[in-house]
């Protein structure tokens, strides 16, 4: 009898002990990347799990080519991960409209999230007046150049269209391509260039007016911007020598070309900082960055196009909403963790838009990236920013702006007709309440 009783008590102690120390799982579906995955496992998943005793974060990696569709399928079935990661606001809008995401207003108020984030970035996750997404990373488009090459030849880094076309001629005379970039493997690369020309020819104010419906996309200033892009792409071959070459090369190719002086410059997003540093660093040359050149007097000088790279939301059907909220709040409450992870990518990934001071940037970060971060904060802080298409364009016109651009470049449709179709898609999106949040301009 005593033996039985002791056995019962001992079993009860084990059960109580196990219950006290067991954790509830929190799942997060994340895009896989061979270089990034180990860092996210160590510095995000494992760090969070070690920091508290209530929840066990499990990051589930999958290539975006299949993840986006499998995520949509599971969400439609009332399943899916607790933390929903999307490629941007247009995806958030789709899930929010379908009632698949948790309203985060009460949590934002409780934990003070609005006071921790850059204002425009916080507003990018507000749909129909409520918060549904937090940016996992924010980014911009910049111009990179081979600083060593420019100094050797006495070339001036272009800040205007005239200066760009002048240095382009000098670069081509040396047998090099002006810009390297390409869309092989990722057709939406086209929208990077379209956005550059819309914002830096027509200007951010004009783009903003079109986004909110106060100006038509058929306005001559937008037509002129895309006519200039077509001229530079097709007639003058500023990107990799020709349109055909641009279509033929991808990420590894254009980084290699930039690193080996095959091209003097590259227009690309800030997500490239790590790859560029590693690539050109091996050649012995030094790289520099600059804001994209102003392409007309209407652009009102240099600006940084703002964008959200990926977003974090909570599944409305999550098995562990409390745990998912705890993960998000832990990220936003631990600036050092965010900076440490972002530093591993030279601030090209996991750039959660927390309010940072210049003193927050680690000394280990390259001087080029440090300079960019400070200049970006200064210029965007003054309200001088443009708009990337993948963050502020609704779904249908957002696809049209890159997918059908090849038809324009092939000469099968005029820029005027293309923009006429584009305006009709915006009208349709506005009528169906599919437009995305956009920060107000002063």
Residue spans for each PLM region:
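Extracytoplasmic "Venus flytrap"/periplasmic binding protein-like
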Residues: 43, 47-120, 126, 148-159, ...
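A structural signal for short loop-to-beta-strand junctions that line the ligand-binding cleft
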Residues: 81-82, 113-149, 177-183, 192, ...
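Hinge/lid segment of periplasmic solute-binding proteins
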Residues: 87-142, 156, 165, 171, ...
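Short, solvent-exposed loop/beta-turn-alpha elements that line the ligand-binding surface or hinge
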Residues: 103-117, 200-224, 278-282, 294-303, ...
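C-terminal capping/gating helix-and-loop segments adjacent to ligand/active sites or protein-protein/ligand interfaces
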Residues: 126, 211, 368-427
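Extracytoplasmic/periplasmic solute-binding protein
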Residues: 128, 132-136, 141, 165-218
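Glycine-centered hinge/linker elements that transmit conformational signals in sensory
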Residues: 168-170, 212-246, 292-295
């Amino acid at each position: 009898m005593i033996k039985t009783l002791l056995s019962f008590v001992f079993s009860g102690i084990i059960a109580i002990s196990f219950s006290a120390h067991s954790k509830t799982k929190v799942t997060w579906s994340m895009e896989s990347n061979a270089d990034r995955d180990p860092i996210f496992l160590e510095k995000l998943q494992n760090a969070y799990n070690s920091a508290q005793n209530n929840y066990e974060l499990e990051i589930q990696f999958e290539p975006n080519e299949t993840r986006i569709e499998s995520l949509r399928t599971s969400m439609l079935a009332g399943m899916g991960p607790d933390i929903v990661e999307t490629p941007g606001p247009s995806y958030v809008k789709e899930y929010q409209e379908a009632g698949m995401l948790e309203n985060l207003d009460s949590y934002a108020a409780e934990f003070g999230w609005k006071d921790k984030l850059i204002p425009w970035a916080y507003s990018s996750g507000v749909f129909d007046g409520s918060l549904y997404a937090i940016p996992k990373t924010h980014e911009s488009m910049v111009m990179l150049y081979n600083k060593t090459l420019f100094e050797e030849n006495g070339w001036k880094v272009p800040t205007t269209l005239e200066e760009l076309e002048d240095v382009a001629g000098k670069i081509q005379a040396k047998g090099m391509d002006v810009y390297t970039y390409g869309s092989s493997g990722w057709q939406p690369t086209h929208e990077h260039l379209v956005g550059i020309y819309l914002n830096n020819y027509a200007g951010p104010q004009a783009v903003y007016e079109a986004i909110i419906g106060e100006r038509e996309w058929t306005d001559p200033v937008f037509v002129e911007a895309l006519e200039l892009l077509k001229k530079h792409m097709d007639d003058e071959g500023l990107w990799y020598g020709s349109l055909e070459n641009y279509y033929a090369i991808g990420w590894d190719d254009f980084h290699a070309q930039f690193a080996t002086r095959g091209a003097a410059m590259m227009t690309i997003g800030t997500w490239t900082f790590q790859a560029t540093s590693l690539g050109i660093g091996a050649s012995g040359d030094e790289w520099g960055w600059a804001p994209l050149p102003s392409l007309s007097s209407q652009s009102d000088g240099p600006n940084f196009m703002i964008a959200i790279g990926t977003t974090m939301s909570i599944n409305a059907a999550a098995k562990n909403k409390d745990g998912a909220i705890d993960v998000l709040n832990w990220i936003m409450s631990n600036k050092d963790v965010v900076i440490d992870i972002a530093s591993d990518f030279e601030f090209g990934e996991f750039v959660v838009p927390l309010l940072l001071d210049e003193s927050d940037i680690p000394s280990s970060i390259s001087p080029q990236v440090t300079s960019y971060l400070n200049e970006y904060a200064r210029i965007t802080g003054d309200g001088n920013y443009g708009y990337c298409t993948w963050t502020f364009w609704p779904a249908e016109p957002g696809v049209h702006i890159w997918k059908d651009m090849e038809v324009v470049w092939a000469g099968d449709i005029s820029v005027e007709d293309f923009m006429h179709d584009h305006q009709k898609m915006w009208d349709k999106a506005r009528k169906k309440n599919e437009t995305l949040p956009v920060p107000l301009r002063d």
